[in-house]
Amino acid sequence: MNRDPVKDIHINSETKLSDLISQFGEAGGFVASKVSTATSIVNDMVLEDCTKFVSFPADIMATGTRGLMNQIVDNNMADVVVTTCGTLDHDIARVLADYYHGDFAMDDELLREEGVNRLGNVLVPDESYGIPIERWLQPILEELYSKKKHWAPWEIWHELGLKILEEERGSESFLGKCAKKEIKVFVPGPTDGSVGSQLWLFWQSHKDFTLDIFGEEHHLSDIVH
C-alpha cells in the first residue's frame, strides 16, 4: 500500500491558489462544492453577533480537511460543535498514528488480507485505529472515573481534548483545539463509534459509570434558545 500519509490543509492570507491545489493533492478525500454559498454563510457567521454552530460528519476528520476545521476553531469562528462519534475516533487516531492515500477502486478483499481498512480513498491500517484508541483511552477513563461517576458526554470529550494535547502531535487535534478554546463538542450518538465502544467496554467493569444523555440534550437546548 501507499505509505504517503494524509496531511492537513493549512492556509493564510498569503496562500496562493496553486499552493492550495497542491495541498488538496496531499489531503485525501477532499470534495469542493458550492463554494460561493459556503463563503456567504461564513461571511454572515463572522459579521453577525450570533452563536455560531458548526456541524459536520466524521469522514472529513479522516482527511486533510481536518486542518481547515482546526483553523475555524483557531480563528474563533465557532462557538459550539455538533458532530458524530466518528469525529472523535478519527481525530484521536490521527494524532496517535497515520492514515494513508488509497483509491476508491482498490480491492477491499486484498486490503482486508493486509489488515487495511478503506474509507473512500483513504487507507486506515488496523494498527492506526482501534488498537491505539483503546490503549490510549482506557487509562484516561480510569482517571475520569476516579474523579466522579456521572458525566455529561461533552464533559468527557473536553477532558479527552485536554489529554490529547499532551501527545507529540496533539497540536493537530481538533478535539484538543476545542478543549483549549473552551468550545463544547456535542455528540448526539456517543456510543456510535470506536470511542463510544471503549466507553461501553469500560462500563462493563464499572457499572456505576454513567452518561447523562438527557442532561446534555437539555444543556444544548439552552444554548440554542
Describe each region flagged by the PLM.
Residues 1-56, 62-225:
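Conserved catalytic alpha/beta core of Sir2/sirtuin-type deacylases, generalized to analogous enzyme cores
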